[in-house]
Design a protein with these regions (language model features):
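Conserved catalytic network of the ASCE P-loop NTPase/AAA+ motor domain
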Residues: 2-4, 37, 82-84, 140-144, ...
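Conserved helicase ATPase motor motifs in RecA-like P-loop NTPase domains
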Residues: 2-22, 38
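Loop/turn elements at helix/coil->beta-strand transitions in domains of secreted/extracellular proteins
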Residues: 4-7, 87-89, 118-123, 145-146, ...
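Conserved nucleotide-binding/hydrolysis micro-motifs of P-loop NTPases
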Residues: 14-18, 36, 96-98, 155-157, ...
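Conserved interdomain linker/interface between the two RecA-like ATPase lobes of SF2 helicase motors
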Residues: 23-126
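Generic recognition of flexible, low-complexity loop/linker segments
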Residues: 77-80, 137-138, 154-156
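Conserved helicase ATPase core of P-loop NTP-dependent helicases/translocases
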Residues: 121-152
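A short beta-strand element within the Helicase C-terminal
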Residues: 148-151, 155-173, 177-183
Length: 184
């Protein structure tokens, strides 16, 4: 509403794959219908508000998590003001390697220091060898109490959670399609 772009680019999280068969039917859905259902975000902000945190002593990892926490708190206030029951979800993607385990532990510690834990149901972990509060029944409802989901790549395709509002990535981009799917 504030910005009046000359061009709007819309994309799908599902890549176009060549089919060897014509045994499928095509369904056309208007973009406005998909946006109205909350399946597509109206805007994507990259590193929003990072420059507003002015404590030089914070390491970059803590800085990024603090920015995500602040943005989430801002969204919570806006949803409450609009009488909405949406509880915004922060997705935190960590690397696959051993570094990922270190990142997970550091993130869990940062959240725990703010009183946000797996035990109180506000943190979910979705990794191959560790699954806490991660069922779709727990994560997807708009009013779910889970506020933060730590994952590697388990949710890359076919997972729909309209309340997912913020994505924090600590992992390198290795595939453009994977990147589009994750953001989508």
């Amino acid at each position: 509403e504030i910005v009046k772009p000359d061009l709007t680019i819309e994309m799908s999280a599902t890549p176009v794959l060549a089919s060897k068969s014509n045994n499928f039917s095509r369904v056309t859905v208007e973009p406005s219908d998909v946006i109205e259902e909350g399946m597509i975000k109206k805007e994507v902000l990259i590193n929003y508000g990072i420059d507003k945190i002015d404590n030089d002593e914070l390491d970059s990892q803590k800085l990024i998590i603090e920015a995500a926490i602040e943005k989430r708190e801002e969204l919570v206030k806006l949803y409450k003001k609009a009488n909405s029951r949406v509880n915004p979800l922060v997705l935190i993607q960590i690397p696959n390697s051993d570094i990922g385990e270190d990142k997970k532990n550091a993130i869990v510690s940062l959240l725990r220091n703010r009183g946000i834990t797996e035990e109180d149901g506000r943190v979910a972990i979705w990794l191959n060898d560790e699954k806490i509060n991660n069922s779709s029944e727990t994560l997807v409802p708009l009013d779910s109490k889970v506020e933060y989901l730590i994952f590697k790549q388990a949710i890359d395709t076919g997972w729909d959670c309209p309340r997912a509002q913020i994505l924090v990535r600590f992992r390198e981009i290795n595939s453009v399609i994977f990147e589009i799917q994750t953001v989508g």
